[in-house]
């Protein structure tokens, strides 16, 4: 389970970007060649974000998900539009950080390489950055490679940086997901912070699991639109008439 959480965390960190609206299309291929497509629309304003996601896959059909992150309130709301309900998860702040575990957990081997290669995406000059990560523990091994094309030449880049810094300030949530102590998480985050710029295209390859029981996954994600625009504060509120689901 820790390997899976670590993968989610790493992908999440690499996509933490801010005060703009952007749309992204992701395609994935996993076990037995099964493919899927996910469309995302993300709004971010200061310390608030809304993510709308629609996923299509052969096994599960169409799935939708809406999440609101309110760093000012320290919560994440998951919105169920079909039933007009929402759930709430608290985000731990640095002052609420859990005690460090007795067992020291080793940091994964993370490498970041700026290649110097460039290409144009959305008429912006982007640089190729490759991130690799290797994890080996009781649950088995995991290898992770992520190729990103990043640029600073996008609308609202300063706001993007500010949001990322604010989000990483809630690192205790991610740290507990990893099962890592505070020092370990800080070292991990320091390595990730070497990646500058906003990724307009990402390719990810991952192999995870014990020997003889491993599976592989590949995804390709591309930003199709990005812009700065006035965003109404109501976008980041629970819709009127929705009830809390315990």
Regions found by a protein language model. Name each.
Residues 17-246:
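Extended soluble regions of mature proteins
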Residues 3-13:
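Sec-dependent N-terminal signal peptides
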